[in-house]
């Protein structure tokens, strides 16, 4: 069982690396610029992979369009993967937006705002 897990992990990391390189060097569509592969989840049988990506732009409409382009190009990306990795099965790819980065930034801003409010509140109450 542990051997299967390590193989899945190796494949997952290799897919993440190779897909990132393919997106950076091979995909020339201007709607898919500044994309980062943040994670890859692979099924136990290695037949399917969810590719989580983040984009530099914050516009939800551009993100939606870029995801559509990536999912439409998944067959092409899969064929390029087949040439780069030594695997009997190259998984079918499904691209999904990874909102965790944006959510982390939003949470960080909320914490900073709360600290600032607390600081001002304690300064004002100390003046009494």
UniProtKB/Swiss-Prot annotation:
Superkingdom to which the source organism belongs: Bacteria
SUPFAM superfamilies in the cross-refs: Ribosome-binding factor A, RbfA
Pfam families, per the entry: RBFA (PF02033)
Compartments in which it is found: Cytoplasm
GO cellular component, one term: cytosol
Disulfide bonds: none
Keyword terms, alphabetized: Cytoplasm, Ribosome biogenesis
InterPro entries associated with the record: KH_dom-like_a/b, RbfA, RbfA_dom_sf
Matching Gene3D superfamilies: 3.30.300.20
An example Gene Ontology biological process: maturation of SSU-rRNA
Keyword Cytoplasm found: yes
Gene Ontology terms, MF aspect: ribosomal small subunit binding
Assigned protein family: Belongs to the RbfA family.
Matches recorded under NCBIfam families: rbfA (TIGR00082)
Physiological role: One of several proteins that assist in the late maturation steps of the functional core of the 30S ribosomal subunit. Associates with free 30S ribosomal subunits (but not with 30S subunits that are part of 70S ribosomes or polysomes). Required for efficient processing of 16S rRNA. May interact with the 5'-terminal helix region of 16S rRNA.
Subunit comment: Monomer. Binds 30S ribosomal subunits, but not 50S ribosomal subunits or 70S ribosomes.
Name of the featured protein: Ribosome-binding factor A
